[in-house]
Amino acid sequence: MQTDPATGPLDGLVVALDIGGTKIAGALVDDEGRIRVRSQRPTPAREDDETVMGAVGDVLAELAGSPLWEAAGAVGIGSAGPVDAYRGTVSPVNVPGWRDFPLVERVHKATGGRPVTLVGDGVAMTGAEHWLGAARGHDNALCLVVSTGVGGGLVLGGRVHPGPTGNAGHIGHMVVDMDGDPCACGGRGCVERIASGPHIARRALENGWRPGPDGDVSAAAVAAAARSGDRFRPHAAVGCSRTATPGRAES
């Protein structure tokens, strides 16, 4: 567990959970967006539902060991999707053991009955960007997150728009290549299959890219190679570009 030495009022302190296919991160966050305490575990993504929930429980238990825990009044969850915010369930494509998993109910119990809000991780990220980041001051925006999967969120009319189920803007499983590779969701040619971190690296290797002396085959290494002038052509950005209309959300 990492603790920020910052001091100050604890009004508005909340428990935040970020659940993805690679890691489960948790934090106690104050009303200025500062992370006061954080915890993280690897996601046992190929294990059964209770094993994955066990990792979530470990993160929450570590946060609960902080003296700040009692001041946290609510829980916010951004989860890989799709999610169903109305029912409080999650079915992340990259965590196959969770299908209609009652995450809100389980976290509600694990946190002593605190109220829990669930949205897709892309929607949660969009809320943060609109509050404190790149979308601040913009009435309309599409924000994208590229990690183990690909997600997104929308700002419309100055407000984050999660949609009725908490998935609005989740572009990862839009089909952009009808003849593309099969996706874990059951579709073919999805954005996530083309432009997620692991698949950016995979497609770069297939198109002739070779890693440097350190052997790093991550998407970050691919991006660094592209910036340095490497002439390989993985076309990883094509999927994302096909999901957007020409021009910017705001002129």
Question: Can you name each region flagged by the protein language model?
Answer:
Residues 18, 76-80, 119, 143-149, ...:
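Short beta-strand segments
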Residues 2-54, 89-90, 166:
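Short glycine-rich, Thr/Ser-proximal phosphate-binding strand/loop in the N-terminal lobe
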Residues 1-11, 134-140, 187:
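Nucleotide/phosphate-binding catalytic cleft detector across ATP-hydrolyzing
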